[in-house]
UniProtKB/Swiss-Prot annotation:
It is a multi-pass membrane protein. The chain crosses the membrane at residues 9-29, 60-80, 96-116, 127-147, 155-175, 180-200, 210-230, 263-283, 294-314, 327-347, 366-386. GO terms for cellular component: plasma membrane. HAMAP family: NhaA. GO terms for biological process: regulation of pH. The gene is nhaA. It is found in: Cell inner membrane. PANTHER family: NA(+)_H(+) ANTIPORTER NHAA, SODIUM ION/PROTON ANTIPORTER NHAA-RELATED. This is Na(+)/H(+) antiporter NhaA. Keywords: Antiport, Cell inner membrane, Cell membrane, Ion transport, Membrane, Sodium, Sodium transport, Transmembrane, Transmembrane helix, Transport.
Length: 400
């Protein structure tokens, strides 16, 4: 049975997928219509602030990718901590299958991408693009099917997505960091100690965490490590429970920010990153090794990796198929993990530093693979549910 909190999470994530789709479509219309010049100028408006000798100035698109997405990763960190302490990740037995699937869903897509691009060192930087899963879109498709999809499969997908996001965070920290600044690292370390002190003293004032979180974000941004990691680090120091009080600061902040993430941050990210120009894109661009690596990595690599690794784990007795599901419905869910969209676009921006070297075919490939995975995953899950209904009806008739 799903808890009320889990049901609310599913509904918000699924409805948020509609906003994501709308934002992406609007961006495509802007980029390929008469508003393309305005759209591109808007994305590159310089914004920033100065404090004494300190100056922080970036184009709007980088404020979104480095700033707003840090808030997204902050909420992701809160969800992860809550799940580890009292949620789905608390029970090791429930984590085995999603963890195995997440590993397969990273290894196989990355291998497929590398096969196509190992001869070009710059192109090969995008190996992590097809390893991500967009939870909002995948859950959106599942919610359309409603009760046809067992709750156990929804829990499996969410748990896999959480583990997948943790791996994405580690990948960004290890492989997509720039030139490192020891001074900025030192400042970040001091701030982290401050956050640790707040946690140990069980301070429940949001403003204290906010101030230190902003300082941490700036120091991490200047350190050469991607600034979004500051969000995850800050989240881990937010107390789940407060002494002498029934309220949870972590849950309170998560509740306050979740709507902004779902209906503002992610749609804005989609709007500024999904505006792909279709001018000059033809068969040559779509058959480029990067495009093939992304499309085949997301569409084939994710489903083969997740399903294949889970199949082996189940057959060896390390895990069990989710309750009330069959191999067909489980396979349909594995196909949905090929919906990369937001996270894949985000890793794409880190891989190629927002250049248009591949004429946006790399971004278009993410959209193509995500759409194919979404449509086919829906069809397979629907077929599995119809087949299950027929078997149940036949069993009822035979009982009479």
């Amino acid at each position: 049975m799903c808890s009320e909190n889990f049901k609310k999470f599913l509904v918000s994530e699924a409805s948020g997928g509609i906003f994501l789709i709308a934002a992406a479509v609007i961006a495509m219309v802007f980029q390929n219509g008469f508003l393309s010049e305005f759209y591109n100028s808007f994305l590159h408006i310089d914004m920033g602030f100065k404090f004494g000798e300190f100056l922080l100035q970036k184009p709007l698109i980088l404020w979104v990718n480095d700033g707003l997405m840090a808030i997204f990763f902050f909420v992701l960190g809160l969800e992860l901590k809550r799940e580890i302490l009292e949620g789905e990740l608390r029970n090791p037995a429930q984590v085995v299958l999603p963890a195995v699937g997440a590993i397969g869903g990273i290894v196989v897509p990355a291998f497929i991408f590398y096969l196509f691009n190992h001869t070009d060192s710059f192109a090969a930087r995008g190996w992590a693009i097809p390893t991500a899963t967009d939870t909002a879109f995948a859950l959106g498709i599942i919610m359309i099917l409603g009760a046809r999809v067992p709750a156990s499969l929804k829990i499996f997908l969410v748990t896999l997505a959480i583990i997948d996001d943790v791996c994405a965070i580690l990948i960004m920290a290890i492989f997509y960091s720039g030139d490192l600044s020891l001074i900025s690292f030192g400042v970040a370390a001091i701030v982290i100690l401050g956050l640790l002190a707040l946690n140990l003293l069980n301070v429940n004032k949001k403003s204290f965490y906010l101030i230190l979180g902003i300082i941490l974000w700036i120091s991490v941004l200047k350190s050469g490590v991607h600034a979004t990691l500051a969000g995850v680090i800050s989240a881990f120091f937010i107390p789940l429970k407060c002494k002498n009080s029934d309220k949870s600061l972590l849950k309170e902040i998560e509740h306050d920010l979740h709507g902004y993430i779902t209906y503002f941050v992610l749609p804005v990210f989609a709007f500024v990153n999904a505006g792909i120009s279709l001018k000059g894109i033809g068969l040559e661009q779509l058959t480029h090794p990067v495009s093939l690596g992304v499309i085949l990595g997301l569409f084939l690599g994710k489903q083969i990796g997740v399903f294949g690794f889970c199949f082996v784990a189940i057959k060896l007795g390390f895990a069990k198929l989710p309750k009330y599901s069959c191999w067909i419905s489980f396979y349909g869910l594995c196909i949905l993990t090929g919906i990369g969209f937001t996270m894949s676009l985000f890793i794409n921006s880190l891989s190629y530093n927002d250049t248009d070297k591949f004429a946006y075919a790399d971004k278009l490939s993410v959209l193509i693979a995500s759409v194919i995975s979404g449509v086919l995953g829906y069809i397979v899950l629907y077929i599995a549910s119809v087949r299950k209904e027929k078997i149940e009806v036949k069993a009822q008739n035979e009982s009479f």
